[in-house]
């Protein structure tokens, strides 16, 4: 099995569901990995999230997950702007990421046919393993 020294978790700050971030943090702890929690603000989406700075992302994570998950865990917070899939893949290359983790919401076929999905775009763009975590 691969040693996952650097894991990237692509966070969606608009999502209230915390299943995938908890899973990502537990996974990083299990492998004693550094986890990079990365938010990408896509200007094409026409919305700028108010917490698109590293310190604000860190605060949001600390307010969302149990404190025990962050203890003794090497966490890097990062923010970027651009196409979500391209920025996640660029970050992964720049920081020698071994595994990308993304949350996934199940959508209807109609929704899937009409709208792009960030997680699917990341999977299609990345040239390294991507672990998809279903959101409840």
Segments from the language model and where they lie:
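Short, hinge-like loop/turn segments at secondary-structure boundaries
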Residues: 52-56, 118-120
